[in-house]
Each structure stands twice: as structure tokens, then as C-alpha cells.
Amino acid sequence: MKTKKMNEPGKIMLLFLVAIMFTVQAVAQNLSVSGLVQDGTTGEGVIGANVVVKGTTNGTITDLDGKFKLQAKQGDIIVISFIGYKTQELPAAAQMKVVLKDDSKQLDDVVVIGYGSVKKEDLSGSVVAIKAEEMNKGAVTSPEELIMGKVPGLAVAQGDGGPGSGSTLRIRSGSSLNASNDPLIVIDGIPVANNSAPGTPNALSTINPNDIETFTVLKDASATAIYGSRASNGVIIITTKKGTQGKIKVTYNSSYTFKDPYKRFETMNADEFRQAVTNQYAEGTALGDAARNLINLYPQQSTDWQDAIYQSGLSTDQNISVAGKAGFMPFRVSLGYNNERGTIKTSKYERYTASVNLSPKFFDDHLRVDINVKGTINKNRFADSGAVGAAAFFDPTKPIYGIDTEDPTYGSNLYNYNGYWNWSTGKNTPNTLSSANPLSLLYDVDNAGTTKRSLGNIQLDYKIHGLEDLHANLNVGYDVAKSTGGNYTVPGSFQTAKDSDFKNIGRGNDWNNLRRNHLLDFYLNYAKNIESIQSNINVMAGYSWQHFYYRDLSIYKSNVTENLGTKEGWTYNDDEGRYIQNNNTPSPWENYLVSFFGRLNYSFKERYLLTATLRQDGSSRFSKSNRWGLFPSAALAWSIINEPFMEKARDIMSNLKLRVGYGVTGQQEITDYLYITNYSLGNNTTSQYMGSYLLKPDGYSPDLKWEQTATYNVGIDYGFLNNRINGSIEYYQKRTKDLLNTVSVAAGSNFTNMITANVGSMKNEGLEFNINAVAIQTKDFSWELGYNVTWNTSKITKLTATYNPDYEGINAGSASYGSGTVLQKHQVGYAPSTYWLFQQVYDENGKPVQNAVVDRNNDGQITNDDRYMTKKSPMADVYMGLSSQFTYKNWDLGFNLRASIGNYVYNASVADNGSLNAFSNQGFITNYYKSAVESTGFTLTSSTEQKASDLFLENASFLKMDNITLGYTFKNLFTSKLSGRISASVQNVFTITKYSGLDPECNAIDQSLWPRPRTFSLGINLNF
């Protein structure tokens, strides 16, 4: 039978029907998905959220309104994710509305460490991260104030009361005697130099606190060794705020502060002083008659010198930032202005800041770019802090301004210097032993400086296509600071007249300094979750190059009639009769640091963790034989909470981890090129032949090398009730070897008899404990507490190359009176800077006997051999921090307490001014401490030995309330887009201490510290 062939129209019809069937099937399987992704809190669209079909590479991101379109199939699962939100998985639908909920824990779990980041649960070293919302509140103008008292093991010692003054930071005490003890500061991946430009107290002082997102404090060597030769004193990593993916938001912060200089020295007023001097000196004697004549020059005059120099301080801090996403570009831009009028007249500080951050992504998010640029201008009008002591002890019976006083020998205007009253021994002949009029110290000297700083970097992180577990990271950065300024003392002032070389002509000092730091880092990072063996591995290896360049110019000249401040040099012009500008040669120097580094993080079953790092540094500061140093570290951690046998305990315990670490770090913050034989130009004032044309060799140390610190650390992290209660306990021990010390060398073996060499060692150990708790949590009320305590001890174990029981140690600290009275020493067996004093003699009633100290060696004479090491030092044995935060509905109240126990201060102000003998044959008369004289009864001129007596060594332990803040948070004010917070705060609320000086938190030797004011602030924060 023949088969009938289909004709052409039939074929076409059949093909058409088949096509329709396949099309219907395809339409049934394919789905065009449209949707909106919203923020669960604000309801706003989330820009840049990832929308992906699960199990495929088919995906997109949301647009500026949070909308997206995607092709999918029936039954597909759509995965929606974005940083800071909980990931959602939903069935595909033609129309989708997705609400993302906040997942702040996801962000909390990531901690920034050196050259990367790690989940908090995977940390094996001693690391503390402080987020913006956890930082101290109130009138904060310097970054270190944000974390004061917050971190166990970190001591933040406030600067004096001057505007713009910075603090001193110490992590687990210092590791050096003659090199730096400052921690390494890393800002957005740039390690910055600690030797800040003149006019800037530390490396942080030019950073706007409002720009800071997080602080990460690395304390033990297993965490810090990745920074090698600069990490012996710990590391503080600062990340600044970045652009966001959401809609553009504007934030404005404003605060106004009043500063009260409430602390005063307790001295006599004019009437008390006249009476005391009259009672002290007998009438009819040469000394008594001279004293009476001086206090009766102006019988009706009464001056409160402390009131004369102090003023109420006022400050304002204004900051505005704009953050969001413009097109594909997340960005943040900020501007800041801070203006402080100090509590001592003439003092003033201004800071202008600007920052820009851009953080775009390219190539399907494979290339992430971070661009950061920060600029700062600091302007400082410095007041002479010596005016504090001068005001306390200047004769209260004398006027501020010069009075036309007749003298039988010298005529009129005997005591008038440029309009200010000052002590004189003759016409235009100042008394060189007396202090200047306190107001003259402030107004006859113009001392000002300006520092301009720019800090920036561009960081590229590329996720390799086809090998997404491998990242390549390149970071190129810079830090440049230029400081200019000078001081000028006016002609005719007491200060210029007191200078025997220049008499009454003006004089000045000019500086012009440059600090430049260039950085290049490159590293590869491979991270892989190997499910088959229940392991996570993260390997990083890299290279770093850093160049530091410094240029300093400082010129001292006389016979000037104006403040030449920022001019770069002067030369004398005979025609004009004064110094004029000329070109001077500055003194530049530089050094390089080249490094290779690597790190391995490995975890098994999320229970057993290993971290190992290795860094090799090469520094041009050292000779070729000692140029390279190797700095290894290793840490193990056991996440006990993840063990099966802890399953029942997890109802109560949320974290339990044991950590053990060891590592070696270095110290290279020393003077450059001490190993080289340098030649210096002779002084042009020398009487030697050839004078300034003579080149002479300096001493050198060819074998100089790194100071090295080996650190052991054991820690336990704990958490209860879903980490509602959490904290850690740490024990650490640091052993530093090859400490730098100045030692003698054999005659003829060098160009000097003393050189710097690596001969010392020191031991440092301590315990840390901290606890954080949400004590109460209800719908409307919460109470959060944080407490930390650190115990620390340090001891020098070696100071010479070979054992020498007769070695007397190194002089470490001196008072400024006399020719510089030594009060502290570094000595083997004692803490660094231990006080070295004479032992005071007391009578049978327990009263100190003036100018009587113990002859401890019984040789019949009082010499320095009778001094003893007191076993007391300025370092605290224990320091603590306590923070508390109450929240009720929209109200919040918080405070911060800080304590220091076991620290001692030598009260040199009392030692120098604690005797009733205000007048002698020196031709001037001074006030004195009332309470000191009342307690000791001293009436004679104190001897040099008396001024170095342990009588004036005081326990300076203290408890301070640094801050208390009350705030109210509001939302939807006038419009749904306006929210914010208003606050009132008090800083330096109270201090509890037995110390008799103005403030126990001062340098080891207290000589007229500029008192810290109590401040009252009002602030407002607005978010648009």
C-alpha cells in the first residue's frame, strides 16, 4: 500500500502546531519576576541588594528604588541578600515584595584585623573591637576619648587642660626604656608614624572622632605579630565610616561646650601674705626690713593671680556628613569644624576636617574599590603653661600692670616691663632668679602653629573570576603633614630683658616641618570552606613597602620687631638694623621599611582553631648585618561550647572558648642611622679653632638591632543567656630583650665615651578581666553594664651586657628646679622610672624635720649615695573602667567611671613652694602652699636634698567619673524623614583621690599641671 505524501500546506500547518505546543510549554515554565526589596525598619527601598535564583548564577541587583526584574522558572527559589540584613529565600512569583530584617549580629561578627578581617567566633588572639554605638559619648574632640576606660589592658592618660591636648595610650604597659612605648596606629589600612608634627600631640589628634566607625585593639603577639617590628606596644586599628547602599542620608551633629577651670592652688591672699611675712621676719634686721619694704610697696594692692590668668573656656563642634549611593557609587562626604577657647587666656585651638569615601564595585561585584581621603587643618595658639605655677606663687601684693614707682636710686618705672609689673634689681635690670609676671608670660609671647595633614588611600580587592575563593588586594596610601609656626617675644618685655645676651630686643623661633609617609601593600588571600573534612582554611601572603621622609627647620634669631612665625629663616640686614628673611637649609632624613608577611587561619569542626603568622621586616635604620628581623606567632583556640558534650549547657551558656598564643614582635622606633659614622658641623658660637667650619665625627653603634618582645597569652571567652552576659579573662607575660641603653665604651674605640647599645631586658605580666551585661531588658526599659579591670607589673631584669652589681642605673626623670634634680631611675630589679629619693627624717611627733634626710650609709655626710629606690613608680598596679547605660523609651542616661590604683606622683610644686621662707636675699618674694606649710611647718629655704625627699612622693590613686550624658531620641519630627537626638553631658564630673595636687592624672613629676576643666555640653544630632 502506498503512503500518501503530505502536501506543502500540511507540512507548514504541522510545524506551526508543534511550535505552538513548545511555546506554550516554554511560557508555562519561564516566569518574568518583578519585585521590590524594602528595609524592614524604615520601609525604604534597599539599593544594591543581591537577587539570585538559588543554585544558579542567574541574578541581578535592585535599582535606586529597591526594585528588580529577573527571569526565572516556576518552582525556582529566589535568594535575596544584603550586608547587614538577614538573607531571605522565597518561591519565585510574578510580583514579589520582600522585606529584609536587620541582622546587626552579622556585622558584629566581623572584626577588622591586620590585612583583612575575621569572624569574631574565629578569633584566637587577644582582640577587642569597639563599635560606634559602644563608644563614649559627650563632648569628645579627640579620638582616644571615645574608648577611654572601655578596653581592658588599654590605659589612656589624658593630656593637660589645654585646648587640643592629646592623650597618652599604653597597651599592657610599655615594652621599652629608651624607644617609643606608643602603640602602632593603623587608619584605614595605613600604619601612621607616631612622631607627629609639632603642634599635634599624637597621631590621632588630626582625626575627626565623628568619622570613626570602629576601633580594634590588638593586644597579644599572636594578633599583633603580623605588623612585626612595630607591634611590641600593641596595635590600634581604626576604620572610618564608609558610603552606604541605601538612599542618600544627611547627618548633622552640633555641640556647644562651657569649660569651668574650677581647680586652684591653695595659696594666701594679699592680707594673709602680708601678715605671714610680717610674722616670719623680725623687724630691725636687714632681711626683715627688706621683706617689709617689698610687701608694703603698694599697701592697698591685692591681686588674685590665678583669677587673672584663667577664663571660662568655650567651644563649638560642628559636623555634617552626606552618605548614600549616587548611581553605582556608594559614597560618604563629611565636613567638620571645632573651635576651642582655652581656660588660660590667649589659648585657642581650631580644627577643620574633611573626608571623602567612595566604595564602588565592578565586574559583577568581583572588584571592590575603596577610596579614602581625609584632610585636616589644625590651628593652635599656645599659652605658656608655666603661667599656672607663676600665678600660684607670684606675690599677691603686687599689681598686674606696671605702676610708676619712684626709687631713690633708680628713679621711676623700676618694675615696669612693657606695661607689666615684674621684679627688678635695677633700672632695666630684671631679677633673673624670679618668675615673670603671669600675664606677661601670656601676652608678651606670641606662640602659634598650623598643621595641615592629608591622609588617604585607594584599596582594590579583586575576587578572581573562576576562582572566587582567591582575592588579590592592593593598597596604596599616603600620610602627609606640614607644620609651620613660631614664637615671638616682644621687645622691652621682662623675658627679653632677662636674657643677658639680647637685653630688651625682640627674639623669636620659627619652625617649618614636613612629615611624609608613602605605603604600598599587596597580598593574596585564599579562603575555602571544605565541607568534606569539616574545615575552613584562610591563607594570606603579602608584601609591604613604606617610605618615611622628614624635614625639619628651626631657627632662633634676635633683634626682631614682629612675629616672623612661618618664615623660613632670617639674616641680619645692616641697613634695616634687623633680621630679615633668607633661605636656610632644612635638615631632611628618611627611612624605609620593606616587609614580607603571611597568615594561616584554620578551623576544624568549628571547634578547633589555629592561627599562625610570620613577618620579615627590613629597616634602613639598622646596618646590613642587623637589617632584617623575623617575627613569628601562633595561637590555638578551642571552642568548647561547640563540643557535643556541651549541648545541654547551651541552654545557659552561649560561648566558652579557650585561647593560647605566643609570638615575637619588634621595636624599631629609634633615631635613624645610629650605626653610621656621621659628621656634624661645629657650633658657630664655639671658641674652638675653625668654629662652625669644623666637621667632627659623632659616636656610632654598628651592632645596633631591634628590641624584641616575646609574649605569652592565655585567655577564656565566655557568654551566658545568648551572650546577654559576656566577657573574657586573660593572662599575659611579655619578655623584652635587647633593650636600648646608653653604655660606656673603651677609650679610643669610638668617637665618644657613651653609645646606644642593645644590652637590657625587661619582664611585664598581668591579668585582665572584663564583663558586659544587659542587666534589665523590657519593652520600655533596659540597663547595660560594662566593667573591666587590669592588673599589671613591670620589672627591669638587665641593663648591662655583663652582670655588674655596682651599676647604678639610668637617670629617668628630673624636676626643673635647681640645675635639674633627678628623681627617678631605671634600675635592675625595679619597675621602669622608679622614684630614687632621700629618706625624710621625722621628729618624735611625726612631723618632718626640714632639711634633714637619713644618712643611710652612715658615712657622716649626705650625698646621692644616701638615696634609695622607693619601689614606687608612676605606673598603676591596677586600672579599671565601668560604663553604665540606662534606656527608658526615648530617653537614655549613661556614665563612665575610671580608676587607677597604685600609681605615685612626686609633687614637685609642693617641694619647691612648700616653705614659709618666701623671702631671702634673692631680692623678690613669693607666695606658697597654705596647706603644705600648715602641715609641715617649714620656715627655712629648702635644701636640694629636701626637694628630693620622699616626703613629697604621694599616692595618686584615683576614681574619676569622666562623663555623664542624658539624651532624648526622636523620630518623625515634623516629617517622617527627620530623626535625631538631643543630649546634655558633663565631662570630668568628679575625682576621688588622696593626692594633694590639682590632678592625680599627671606626669610622674607634677610641676604646675594645666588643670583640666569641668565641661558642660549641649548637643543635637539630626538625620534627614
Predicted region positions:
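Short loop/turn motifs that connect adjacent beta-strands in outer-membrane beta-barrel proteins
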Residues: 243-248, 327-329, 363-369, 384, ...
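Extracytoplasmic gating/loop element in the C-terminal half of outer-membrane beta-barrel translocons
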Residues: 293-294, 306, 435, 439, ...
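Flexible loop and strand-edge segments within Gram-negative outer membrane beta-barrel domains
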Residues: 261, 297-336, 340-347, 353-432, ...
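Small-side-chain secondary-structure face that scaffolds active or pore-lining regions
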Residues: 342-355, 366, 372-376, 382-384, ...
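Surface-exposed loop/turn segments flanking beta-strands in extracellular/periplasmic regions
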Residues: 271-301, 390-440, 491-506, 551-583, ...
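Outer-membrane beta-barrel transmembrane strands
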Residues: 311-330, 335-338, 352, 433-487, ...
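Conserved small-residue
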Residues: 251-300, 554-556, 774-874
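Short, small/polar-rich motifs associated with maturation and membrane association
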Residues: 1-376, 384-385, 428-429, 455-456, ...
